[in-house]
Design a protein with these regions (language model features):
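C-terminal regulatory/interaction regions
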Residues: 175-329
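N-terminal membrane-targeting hydrophobic helices
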Residues: 1-216, 221-233, 324-328
Length: 329
């Protein structure tokens, strides 16, 4: 989830546990709710030390405990009179909330690293969801603005209402994920991808072996079933070597491996491609169907010369509407 949502939910849970009466420990919990994402500062070291990657060791029980211990030691120096044990408790809770929220999405986190590589990902929400981001920004404004401008009783009511709203949202997402999981098995798919709308999901099945790859997916709407035609795409190994390239399928076959080599991240997500004709041949858009943000998807644009087979590759964010893929909007 986005950083604002992590901090706000950790804040509200700390608020609920203290009944809104201990600002120091509420602040400690909300700070800890955001600290695991400080691993973004360690990215230059991640190539040498993989545990320092984003969603690595800082997103584990060990990592958040280290943060909590540090807060318990430094906290009383910053806020005289603060109880170190309570600081430890609320910072541990805030950090664990961060892990659980990330695992609730289609990102994966290693809660038991470095002792185990087992990952947690429930695929119940998007990692970056415009709905929750808007909720969090609004919540942040209300909590900060009202703190010193309205009576304390009104501020407490706002806090409780926001806490109930967020918990209700998470319950809605969890129940929807359970329902769509049953439909996934019924329809013969192997995975689900959440969209921004908790009632719309993608059902996915992917196969990859000996250089060949294929995927199929369809949009599922809770209460209505599969509402769009299934989309499918596949690549054989080895790709065709004949020139000139005359069909869209040949363009897909030839561009697949260069595109995946250009973006290892794209190669590790569920992906799809669309093909359009161009002046010299074909333009192929390979993009992720798993990580879409505000109607755009990251991917690789491949301009393929039909006569020579030469390719020009460029990273970009594509508007899904431009790619004529209404399934993914």
């Amino acid at each position: 989830m986005d950083l604002f949502t992590h901090v706000i939910i950790a804040y509200l849970i700390s608020f609920g546990l203290t009944l809104g009466k201990s600002p120091v420990y509420i602040a400690a919990g909300s700070l800890a709710g955001g600290l695991p994402d400080s691993d973004i500062l360690l990215m230059p070291l991640a190539r040498r030390f993989p545990l320092l990657r984003h969603h690595g060791i800082t997103h584990s029980i060990l990592g958040v405990t280290i943060f909590a211990v540090g807060g318990a030691i430094l906290g009383p120096m910053v806020v005289p009179g603060a109880n170190a044990w309570l600081l430890l408790l609320f910072m541990e809770i805030g950090g664990l909330v961060h892990i659980l929220l990330d695992g609730f999405t289609h990102f994966a986190v290693p809660p038991f690293a470095p002792f185990s590589n087992v990952e947690l990902h429930l695929d119940a929400d998007r990692a970056v969801n415009g709905v929750t981001l808007a909720m969090s920004l609004t919540s942040f404004f209300l909590l900060v603005y009202e703190r010193n401008t309205v009576p304390l009783a009104d501020w407490l009511i706002t806090g409780w209402l926001l806490l109930v709203t967020y918990l209700g949202y998470l319950v809605l997402r969890g129940v929807a994920r359970y329902i769509v999981g049953k439909e996934m098995k019924k329809e013969g798919y192997t995975a689900v991808i959440p969209t921004a709308n908790p009632f719309h999901w993608l059902l996915v099945e992917e196969h990859e072996a000996s250089g060949s790859w294929s995927t199929r997916f369809a949009q599922y709407t809770i209460g209505r079933g599969i509402r769009s035609p299934q989309k499918a795409i596949g690549v054989e190994a080895p790709p065709p070597a004949t020139l000139p390239v005359t069909t869209a399928n040949e363009a897909i076959q030839l561009s697949y491996r260069p595109a995946m080599q250009r973006s290892r991240w794209l190669a590790s997500t569920y992906r799809y491609a669309t093909v359009n004709s161009s002046a010299n041949g074909f333009r192929v858009h390979w993009f992720s169907i798993e990580f879409t943000v505000f109607g755009r998807a990251p991917g690789i644009r491949v301009d393929l010369d039909a006569r020579t087979g030469e390719m020009h590759l460029e990273r970009s964010w594509f508007r899904l509407r431009d790619l004529a893929n209404p399934t993914l909007r």
